[in-house]
Each structure stands twice: as structure tokens, then as C-alpha cells.
Amino acid sequence: MTMDSNTFEIKNCLCCWYDLLGYGAPFVNSKWDLHNGQCKENFERIEQLRLLFTTSLAVKPLGTRLTFNDGFASTIDVDPITPETFYETLLFLEGALHDFESINVEDQRRNFPGARGVITFGQRFSYDHCNSSYDLLSERTVSYHPAEFQMNTAFSKAFIMEESGSRAGIAGSHLYIDIDVYHHIARAANQIGCKIPTIKVEDDVLVLEIFGPKGWFATLQFDSAPIIYGENSNYKNRGIETTLYKYKYMHSVIDDLANEAAYQQSLRYSMMEEESDSE
């Protein structure tokens, strides 16, 4: 029996998966006994990152996050392509990059190795629109199945690629972005009449300029050397064939607005202090 995909609602989406590095070693060394003192380090580590795991810039305004163990995924639907949803997609991407940077800064400040992540593009199909199941007799939730992560191929691909690690050239506490993310942004920008993203290479740095409905949105920098992910004897690609780029830096219009807001706030405090001193 064959199924016609047109009878199902399949949505395009972006998804990121971030995973703490070195988190499994204490569990392995303790034989997976949480009472073992070696696990205390992991408890303290995840507790310090708790707020960064459970709150996110990427989930505003419309993204959704799924957190478990030492990793989390954030996803957003990118259909239908309109100026509004395109801008929300850019906000999600900008927030996801800042989320990754925040986790790495905080984790490495405490001499931990940080996180590794992948952002990719895919589709999702929700087979159950109820996010959880509640048993009235026992008065408890008996299952969780968030619609946004049901059959989410972007989530699956990000998880698989990140898990491949250094065997696939995805090494260290870095973030890697699938070229399919760029392809979607370029396609969507063209469809709604925005300026197409521009790419140039300066020395060993690939510079990507992204534009939104109101003009320039962000400048992203990557290592110019591509990472070809596909069939390879060193790892199982699970049918994924794409190209990744290692993220280095971002400057966005949101950064400028935040800096301006901080500057204005500092001026207010300064003026208040001057008025207080003059009284």
C-alpha cells in the first residue's frame, strides 16, 4: 500500500541540536550510578546551565524547544513563506546562534569543554496534535509527544550529524550550519522580494550577508572550508548528504538595537545621578 504525501500536512522547518561535550564520561566512570560522587560534577554543570537550557532567544516569537539530558533542540516552522514568517525565521536563526554562544561562554568559564551543535533544514509531520496524554485515574501525565518534534527530519538530521563528531569533521565546541539553511533563506527571500543573501570569501573566512523585509539583518562569518557530509567509512551518514560550514561570528541588527538600548539606559542613569548630585 502506498501513501500519497499530498494527503498529509508536511511542513518545512529549521531545527538546531546542541549537546554538551564530555558529559557522558563521569557517568561511564561511575557505572551509571547517580549516587557515585563522580556524577556530582555533572549535576553542578547542568544546574549552572539550567536557565540557558530552559529559556531561549530562539523560541521567541514562535520557536519550540525540547530539552532532555545534556542537550536540547529548538525548531520553527518556516511555512508559509510570507514577509512575516521570513522575518520570524531570521529571528529564530539569530536567537539560536546567540543561544549557542551563551552556553559555550558560560560552560567554558567554569573550565568545561562547552557544547557542539548543528542547525539544519528539513520537514516535519505531526501524527498527533495532542502534546501529551493524561490519565484521569492516576491523575498524571503518562506520555509526552510534542507536535513540533513528531517525525521532524530536521531534528533527526541535526542529531545524527552532531553525533558523528570528529569522524565527520564536526569537532570541538563549535556550531555547524547546513547549507540547506542558506538555500531556504535565499529561496524565501527571492519569493517575497527581499534582497538575496550575498556571499564573499575574505582570506579563510566566508562572509554571509542576510537581508530581511526592512533591509540588512545580519552578517555571519564561517570557516571557508566546507565540510562534506555523506557516505563515508568512518561514520554512518544515514542517508544524509549535504555540506556544513563551521560558524565563527555574527553581527545583527538586533545586536545594534540592544547596544543602542543599553546606551540609552546608561544615559538615563547618568542623568539621574547628575540630577541627584545637583539637589
What function would you assign to each model-found segment?
Residues 1-5, 12, 165-279:
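Intrinsically disordered, glycine/charged-rich C-terminal tails and inter-domain linkers
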Residues 2-99:
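Catalytic NTP-binding/metal-coordinating core of nucleotidyl cyclase/transferase enzymes
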Residues 9-12, 68, 112-114, 169-171:
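Short, well-ordered loop/turn elements at secondary-structure boundaries
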Residues 17, 114-120, 170-178:
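A structural signal for short, well-ordered beta-strand segments and their strand-loop junctions
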Residues 23, 124, 181-183:
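Short, solvent-exposed loop/turn segments at secondary-structure junctions
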Residues 52, 99-106, 160, 164:
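Amphipathic alpha-helical regulatory segments at dimerization interfaces
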Residues 56-84, 104-152:
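Catalytic core of nucleotidyl cyclases, primarily class III adenylyl/guanylyl cyclases
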Residues 127-173, 184, 188-192:
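Glycine- and acidic-residue-rich phosphate-binding/metal-coordinating active-site segment common to enzymes
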